[in-house]
């Protein structure tokens, strides 16, 4: 696990629609070891390694959930809208970073009312998004604008990357910088002359899987492995039957989500690879969300796709948590699978005629 790369990626500000910082990190990381780097029309990062055999894509979306400045009042407070899925109770009094159009980062905090000034009824009611504001310590609109903050600036949670104990990693934007980091490690270490390997950092996943569609059209892959996160149900307050994934028990294979079913032969091949290498593997479903697999699997008449996810606590909030052991297990699983992949195996994934 390249913890330095993961930290660099997590500390980048790259809300959906503003992924340049992550794109730059991936360019600098992978340019020395790939044949070509290109981009689709929305800005998804595409690295190619090799030029022979079937096209195999490993995809991790670059964007994170965040906010955008929508109004600056006369007193210097900012109003904002959410980008991606947020729960309002996870937002109050958290520090944020505003990225100006020139790339300057301005710190702020989502303001909260002191309990002394709240009625008992108000204390029992969650604050709506429309009532929230951001304080950057300015005294007027003019001071805000002098610092370079404008309507339309993107806002991300403040970076807070850390390792806790021997196994846990905590930080913002683990969804889905872990996918980007793992994609990069695979491009650096997998050498299989039988396939053309693509590493994709897709854009705008959190607002509709948009970069998945455009990058799929750009590459036209034969097989796709999507890397993402999934809800860990091993904390108080979560139904662990609906959300069975646990940290430290291995990566999760997504059996279906709102927009995708995996190719069953691809699932069987990965399960066999995990068993052969004595790697733990969990299984999950997601009825209310989707991964980039939901766009890749229907492109060009349909493609074999599977989504593999790291169990993650506290998704779509300021601080998520993953297990290093789960990361290593998933990296080992995919590396082993890609290393032994051949054109014959790839073709077999799309053969649907029953053979006696």
From Swiss-Prot:
It is an enzyme of class 3 (hydrolase). Keywords: Aminopeptidase, Hydrolase, Metal-binding, Metalloprotease, Protease. Transmembrane segments: none annotated. Signal peptide: none annotated. The keyword Hydrolase applies. Binds 2 divalent metal cations per subunit. Its EC number is 3.4.11.-. One of its GO terms (biological process) is proteolysis. InterPro entries: Peptidase_M42 (IPR008007), Peptidase_M42_aminopept (IPR051464), Peptidase_M42_dom2 (IPR023367). SUPFAM superfamilies: Aminopeptidase/glucanase lid domain, Zn-dependent exopeptidases. A divalent metal cation 2 binds at residues 175, 206, 316. GO terms for molecular function: metal ion binding; metalloaminopeptidase activity. The active site is at residue 205. Its cofactor is a divalent metal cation. NCBIfam families: PRK09864.1. Belongs to the peptidase M42 family. This is Putative aminopeptidase FrvX. It comes from Escherichia coli (strain K12). The lineage of its organism: Bacteria, Pseudomonadati, Pseudomonadota, Gammaproteobacteria, Enterobacterales.
